[in-house]
Swiss-Prot record:
InterPro entries the record matches: SprT-like_domain (IPR006640), SprT_Zn_ribbon (IPR035240), Uncharacterised_SprT-like (IPR023524)
Entry superkingdom: Bacteria
SMART domains reported for this sequence: SprT
Active-site residues per Swiss-Prot or TrEMBL entry: 68
Keywords, in A-Z order: Cytoplasm, Metal-binding, Zinc
Any one Gene Ontology molecular-function term assigned to this protein's record: zinc ion binding
Cofactor note as given: Binds 1 zinc ion.
Cofactor: Zn(2+)
Location within or outside the cell: Cytoplasm
UniProt name for this protein: Protein SprT-like
Similarity-based family: Belongs to the SprT family.
Length: 152
């Protein structure tokens, strides 16, 4: 799906569910990571996450488009367009738009675990972040630390 197709799809969804035209731009933004889409208040454009289309297909994308169009049409009309506003929640129910999008399948990265051991007292430290062993010492005996293992 390219930029022209997504623009056409957003315009069709706007006319079908809201009976109002969408007069601005709809584009894919590859930098979006944790959200399905966003409505830009200043430009009135809608940005969508292409990975949601790849993972879940057009049906999920239409749901995200309906959600963003709720923000769009309420903001244009001067009504409450934020997630907590009553107007927004009512319009979501009316057009059967999702309040939240599905979680990304491969969203979570593998967590690395670093293990260090004191050379003096053999106390072991387990950390999620790597530490500078030249700068930091054991909190118990002030001995030097050595890395034991790094697991992911």
């Amino acid at each position: 799906m390219d930029e022209q197709e997504i623009q056409r799809l957003v315009e069709e969804v706007s006319l079908q569910y809201f009976e109002m035209p969408f007069l601005h731009k709809a584009v894919f933004n590859n930098r979006l990571r944790t959200t399905g889409g966003r409505y830009l208040l200043k430009s009135h454009n809608i940005e969508l996450n292409y990975r949601y289309y790849e993972l879940y297909g057009e049906e999920e994308l239409v749901g995200i488009i309906k959600h963003e169009l709720c923000h769009y049409h309420l903001h244009i009309a001067g009504r409450g367009y934020k997630h907590g506003d009553r107007d927004f929640r009512e319009l979501l129910k009316k057009v059967d738009a999702p309040r939240f999008c599905k979680r990304m399948i491969n969203e979570e990265k593998e967590k690395k675990i670093y293990k260090y051991e004191c050379m003096e007292c053999s106390l072991q430290y387990v950390r999620r972040r790597q530490i500078n062993i030249k700068r930091y010492v054991c909190g118990k005996c002030k001995g030097k630390l050595k890395p034991i293992s790094k697991t992911s």
